[in-house]
From Swiss-Prot:
Keyword Metal-binding part of the UniProt annotation: yes
Subunit structure: Homodimer.
Keyword line: ATP-binding, Ligase, Magnesium, Metal-binding, NAD, Nucleotide-binding
GO cellular component: cytoplasm
The keyword Metal-binding belongs to this UniProt entry's keyword annotation: yes
Protein name as annotated: NH(3)-dependent NAD(+) synthetase
Pathway assignment: Cofactor biosynthesis; NAD(+) biosynthesis; NAD(+) from deamido-NAD(+) (ammonia route): step 1/1
Superkingdom of origin organism: Bacteria
Annotated signal sequence range: none
One MF annotation (Gene Ontology) recorded for this entry: glutaminase activity
Classification via PANTHER family: GLUTAMINE-DEPENDENT NAD(+) SYNTHETASE (PTHR23090:SF9), NH 3 /GLUTAMINE-DEPENDENT NAD + SYNTHETASE (PTHR23090)
Gene3D superfamilies, per database record: HUPs (3.40.50.620)
Xref: Pfam families: NAD_synthase
Protein's gene: nadE
């Protein structure tokens, strides 16, 4: 049995109940999420439909001019399948207006700005619709630091933040999410041709096996290496986990003597 295998029916029920319970506690009945065309946000959309009903879910698609056309098409597949409310807001003018005077901007800076622009739109619609912003980052991304602080990582609650990427794929198959989204190469689509795995220098499946041992089984690096995992891979993962710890906590506040 694969260490990452889950009882998918139980997990689905657990996540749906998590959403219902926490929306009720917060006094909200509606949700808003960014629908990118990737599998993570698609899965969250399906969970929200099951938890709140299709009429209470607003999916916002926010393409930039360099976004892969497949991303928007795949997002629309989800909207059509779930029959949820949706809106498309182009962010090209907003991003280009800012970078007009920043000619030396790197792809990373532009990608982070796009993520934060999308966050800003989601929270504005949260106010407009009296809805909670629901996050779409998985556990693998969160612990590798593969997110933009106060960008795609910003949300009121996140139903998939304890699921590794492997779990995301498995649960998506269980829920019969369109296969095009499951089989495509994971990409934040922040610039043309970008893929997550190429950028990080690892595969999600490899990372999940290592991270499961470190985080769930509390094994040391030495114990993980003793199981035969590649040292460069493990070092890459541990370095990313350590370097991104600040993203996983609230801002540090200096305490003064009184």
């Amino acid at each position: 049995m694969n260490k990452l295998d889950l009882n998918l029916k139980e997990v689905h029920n657990e996540l749906v109940e998590f959403l219902r319970e926490n929306f009720k506690k917060a006094g909200f009945s509606k949700a808003v999420l960014g629908l990118s065309g990737g599998i993570d946000s698609a899965l969250v959309a399906y969970l929200l439909r099951d938890a709140l009903g299709k009429e209470n879910v607003l999916a916002i698609m926010m393409p930039y001019k360099s976004s892969n056309p497949d991303s928007l098409n795949h997002a629309k597949l989800v909207v059509e399948d779930l029959k949820i409310n949706s809106k498309t807001i182009e962010i090209t003018d907003m991003i280009d207006a800012y970078f007009k005077n920043e000619k030396e901007a790197t792809s990373l800076r532009m990608g982070n700005k796009m993520a934060r622009e999308r966050m800003s739109i989601l929270f504005d619609y949260s106010s407009k619709e009296n809805a909670l912003v629901v996050g779409t980052s998985n556990k693998t991304e969160i612990y590798l630091g593969y997110s933009t602080q106060f960008g795609d990582a910003a949300c009121a609650l996140n139903p998939i933040g304890d699921l590794y990427k492997t779990n995301i794929w498995d649960l998506s198959r269980y829920l019969k999410i369109p296969n095009e989204l499951i089989e495509k190469k994971p990409s934040a689509d922040l610039w043309e041709g970008q893929t997550d795995e190429q950028e990080m220098g690892l595969t999600y499946k490899e990372a999940d096996q290592v991270m499961y041992r470190l985080l769930e089984e509390n094994k040391t690096v030495e114990e993980v290496l003793a199981e035969g995992f590649n040292k460069d891979l493990v070092d890459n993962i541990v370095r990313r986990m350590n370097r991104s710890e600040y993203k996983r906590r609230m801002p540090l506040i200096a305490k003064i003597k009184r």
